[in-house]
Amino acid sequence: MKTPGHQRVKTARRRTAASTRWLERQLNDPYVQKAQAEGYRSRAAFKLIELDERFSLLKNARRIIDLGIAPGGWSQVARKKAPQAKIVGIDLLEAAPIEGVTIFQNDFTDPEAQKKLIEALGGAADLVLSDMAANTIGHAQTDHLRTMALVEEAAVFASETLREGGSFVAKVLAGGADKDLVALLKRLFGQVKHAKPPASRRESSEWYVIAQNFRGEAYQG
């Protein structure tokens, strides 16, 4: 992916050094530039594109749930790759409307919010996507554990929502508890793999778990 020369950002009077570094990274990130050029709301769209190219997640999907939908890049990709699919998403943050996608602004961990998702989908899901991460506090292990608890809840929800043979994809932060998640998924799915798509930043601890061929039995404690 070709990129223009590295752009530097002058530190404004009210801008911190950290925010200046973030802005400079954004300006020089080829995936940010490509997302803008192709009309995607975030560079994260290319993570799903790359995962789909490797694991064929969207081709035959008819019902899709997008957990942590904001700002909407993953659902944009799903809409494009699976135009026939019913797509339902949820996030604590507001996400601007996407044509053909039903969006709820709710806390996913609220059982009532999960009921809304299931009702709106109108049937068993073929694919549950989760790009969720807990709000960080700056303590690596605490951030890891909080995010993993969220992902495990997403996995349990997927087991209650997917059709037999369906798939679950989730963002994971490395740090130890991810091993428990993989063990859980191996009980629920016939195939569990992991990947770090090229669009994931090298310095990030994130990776993605891809669980396919759901066995058809909901998680039992």
Swiss-Prot record:
Listed under catalytic activity are:
uridine(2552) in 23S rRNA + S-adenosyl-L-methionine = 2'-O-methyluridine(2552) in 23S rRNA + S-adenosyl-L-homocysteine + H(+)
InterPro entries assigned: RNA_methyltr_RlmE, RNA_MeTrfase_FtsJ_dom, rRNA-MeTfrase_E, SAM-dependent_MTases_sf
Q: What does the entry list under GO cellular component?
A: cytoplasm
Name the principal localization, coarsely classed.
cytoplasm
Keywords per UniProt: Cytoplasm, Methyltransferase, rRNA processing, S-adenosyl-L-methionine, Transferase
Q: Active-site residues?
A: K171
Enzyme Commission no:
2.1.1.166
Keyword Transferase set for record: yes
Instruction: Give coiled-coil spans as residue ranges.
Output: none
Q: Which family does it belong to?
A: Belongs to the class I-like SAM-binding methyltransferase superfamily. RNA methyltransferase RlmE family.
Say what the protein does.
Specifically methylates the uridine in position 2552 of 23S rRNA at the 2'-O position of the ribose in the fully assembled 50S ribosomal subunit.
User: What is the protein named?
Assistant: Ribosomal RNA large subunit methyltransferase E
